[in-house]
Regions:
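Short, proline-enriched alpha-helix->beta-strand connector loops that line the catalytic pocket
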Residues: 169-174, 234-238
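Short, solvent-exposed loop/turn and secondary-structure capping segments
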Residues: 61-66, 91-93, 144-145, 166-170, ...
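Gly/Ser-rich "nucleophile elbow"/oxyanion-hole loop immediately N-terminal to the catalytic nucleophile
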Residues: 41-46, 92-137
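Acidic catalytic loop of the alpha/beta-hydrolase fold
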Residues: 182-185, 247-250
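A domain-start/cap signature at the N-terminus of enzymes
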Residues: 4-49, 75, 79, 104, ...
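Primarily recognizes the serine-hydrolase "nucleophile elbow" in alpha/beta-hydrolase
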Residues: 65, 120-172, 183
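Short substrate-entry loop that stabilizes the transition state in hydrolases
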Residues: 43-90, 152, 158, 164-165, ...
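Short beta-strand/loop motif that positions the catalytic acidic residue
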Residues: 176-178, 182
Length: 267
């Protein structure tokens, strides 16, 4: 797992849109919602924005310190948002997932839409280069965002699946990174060791290849990592990275690979 320097606690963070990490609170549906924002020094005009969604039991602070996005943003010159889920989880609109947000009917799609809009109003972000990614429940949430919004140029899920019924999906580039030995969100689909019971990673990949009107995928294998990449209409792409024997985890290569995929998408 990628590790980074631990950021400051929420209480000591500035609330303005400053260089470095800041903390922001917005009202969504009568509920105060919070997100962290990392803004690197020397940010160009019209910078990309990556929205990183934590897993169940995770948090915005944990996601910022665990996955190496801030360090990559320094070199890639993009902004990273880390929304905080209610009760450390996300309501993904399906599959009984997950936790308190699902039980209380929290509208996390509305929250993330509002957080992105807040950032676009206050930071020089290119609205055509906004991306969502997440781990586990956060990865599932990234699919829910792809199914229910049109604001993302690409999404990338790690150890996730698609639980939203996704009746009216928007064409969007999609990458899934998933291990074949994942017991919580099984690569082959079906009932996991906890509550997740969803489609297989190849089936989700096929769904989005169909949505995006993709050609036949090209497949390459390097040791225990197999990459399937399909080119699609309007230069979008749909990719599945399969880790033979990989578990329910964020691989060391995931952050860099996701950013390379995002940066290559049309906008």
């Amino acid at each position: 797992m990628v590790a980074g320097c631990s950021p400051a606690d929420n209480e000591s963070l500035p609330s303005g849109f400053v260089t470095g990490t800041s903390i922001h609170s917005i009202n969504v549906g009568g509920r105060a919602r919070v997100y962290r924002l990392y803004r690197p020094a020397g940010l160009p005009v019209s910078a990309p924005l990556v929205v990183m969604l934590h897993a169940v039991t995770g948090s915005a602070e944990q996601a910022e310190s665990s996955y190496g996005w801030d360090e990559l943003a320094d070199s890639g010159r993009f902004v990273v948002a880390y929304p905080d889920g209610v009760g450390r989880a996300w309501n993904v609109n399906g599959g009984g997932c997950c936790g308190r947000p699902q039980r209380e009917g929290v509208d996390d799609v509305a929250f993330i839409r509002a957080a992105v809009a807040d950032i676009v109003r206050n930071v020089s972000v290119d609205a055509s280069r906004i991306y969502a990614t997440g781990m586990s429940n956060g990865g599932i949430m990234s699919y829910t965002l792809a199914c229910n919004t049109g604001i993302f140029a690409a999404i990338g899920s790690v150890a996730g699946t698609q639980l939203d019924s996704c009746r009216s999906p928007h064409p969007v580039s999609v990458m899934e990174i998933h291990g074949t030995s994942d017991k919580l969100v099984p690569y082959g689909g079906g009932q996991g060791s906890n509550i997740i019971n969803g489609p297989s990673a190849p089936d989700v990949n096929a769904f989005w290849r169909n949505v995006n009107q993709c050609g036949a995928p090209s497949v390459t294998t390097d040791s225990d990592v197999t990459t399937s990449t399909a080119g699609c209409v309007d230069n979008r792409g749909v990719a599945l990275i399969t880790i033979d024997g990989g578990g329910h985890e964020w691989p060391d290569f995931a952050t860099q690979t996701l950013w390379q995929f995002f940066a290559a998408q049309p906008h």
